[in-house]
A protein has these predicted regions:
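Conserved "landmark" site that anchors the functional core of diverse proteins
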Residues: 1-122
Length: 122
């Protein structure tokens, strides 16, 4: 399953749990800014063994994404209104998208960073 980016938010990045053990070599851990929200989205999307799996981290503004196959996904973090094919969908809930459906995520009403996790997120 691929997730096609139709239009990203201006500060949308791919994040994961970061890299540990490299500080002595000058590398910071980095990773998602809100690790709790990232892990929550991953767990809801069905990634419990990989709660640090890659997610989309959206700062202030979401974006528009199309699923090319069926997928379980979840949103967590900032309160960003979202709709799947024009129908509102809640955050903090496992959701199912079918092939061709478009997920539109709006601007944050509160909070700063929202997270989109998809089952199997690498």
């Amino acid at each position: 399953m691929n997730l096609h980016v139709i239009s990203p938010g201006p500060l949308t990045t791919v994040q994961d749990a970061g890299r540990t053990g490299y500080a002595a070599r000058g590398f910071r851990t980095c990773g998602a800014a809100d690790g709790y929200a990232m892990r929550t989205a991953n767990l809801l999307a069905g990634n419990p063994q990989a709660a640090g799996a890659a997610v989309l981290e959206m700062t202030l503004q979401g974006g528009k994404y199309q699923f090319d196959g069926g997928a379980v996904f979840a949103l967590a973090g900032a309160d960003m209104p979202a709709a799947l094919d024009g129908r509102p969908v809640p955050a903090y809930t496992p959701l199912l998208a079918r092939a061709g459906q478009v997920l539109a995520i709006g601007a944050a009403r509160s909070g700063l960073r929202g997270y989109l996790a998809v089952f199997g997120g690498g």
